[in-house]
Amino acid sequence: MPKVRTKDLIEQFHLELISGEEGIHRPIDTSDLSRPGIEMAGFFTYYPADRVQLLGKTELTFFDTLTSDQKQERMKALCTEETPCIIVTRNQDVPDELLQASRESGMPLLRSSQTTTRLSSRLTNYLEGKLAPTTAVHGVLVDIYGVGVLITGQSGVGKSETALELVKRGHRLVADDSVEIRQEDEDMLVGSSPDLIEHLLEIRGLGIINVMTLFGAGAVRNYKRITLVINLEIWDQKKNYDRLGLDEEKMKIIDTELTKITLPVRPGRNLAVIIEVAAMNFRLKRMGVNAAQQFSERLMSAIELGNQE
């Protein structure tokens, strides 16, 4: 099922429907837009018919210089069965040839009061957000000191309980149990909650609680960029865990690699505090302050100094 149809653009941007009402359910499969200037001159070899077409002042001014036969020919070529719609910007008058071609092909012809550049920018942002690659991950997403932390781990390891403690400490819940993730840009993953379980948290033995009702609107947010993954696992005596923080694990989601920290879970460990510190330490590293690296350098300097003596 298509994520975006022409009718969605009409509703989102309050576009005026001039003709082609029967085609408003046409799918839009790309966030790329087209301003068919070269096509107005008659070159249709590489015409991207599957894109939303924008006709601005430049295109229509040139169109006025064409002969009557050329106008009809160009507009018929523009209005294909594949084209989602044509949008005339700046509330300009719609040429009769375009109106006729739209009616014959059933292609939606729309009009906007916005400038071409402004509308193009808004359309691109909207379509990129809607058409971005998506996936779902089992875990909890929390905003901790401005860092989007995705907490993962096996079922029953304590993800939701840890998230509840983090919310009590003033941080904000984004999603629990199922995190919908979309890649809005290169190296940019944004997580949100499915509508059905938005603002809800499931605690074993307690049931489902509404975080916004209990803790207020400041305890939740609708979406957050994910920059850090913390994986909780039951403590394994045979496994060697990182004690210095020099080695950095990575986890790939869609086409983006994220920093991953594995935290062993055992009785007596305050996971909420550890995750808080992990988020703060992650921010420090991004600012160029790496405590583990500094310790390693001091240690090497001390060893070299000892060898010289």
Swiss-Prot record:
Residues the record lists as binding ATP: 153-160
Cofactor(s) the record lists: Mg(2+)
Catalytic residues (UniProt): 138, 159, 177 (proton acceptor), 243
Chain spans, region Important for the catalytic mechanism of both phosphorylation and dephosphorylation: 201-210
Residues that hold Mg(2+) according to the record: 160, 202
CDD domains: HprK_C
Top EC category: transferase
Function recorded in the entry: Catalyzes the ATP- as well as the pyrophosphate-dependent phosphorylation of a specific serine residue in HPr, a phosphocarrier protein of the phosphoenolpyruvate-dependent sugar phosphotransferase system (PTS). HprK/P also catalyzes the pyrophosphate-producing, inorganic phosphate-dependent dephosphorylation (phosphorolysis) of seryl-phosphorylated HPr (P-Ser-HPr).
The protein's assembly and partners: Homohexamer.
Name of the protein in its database record: HPr kinase/phosphorylase
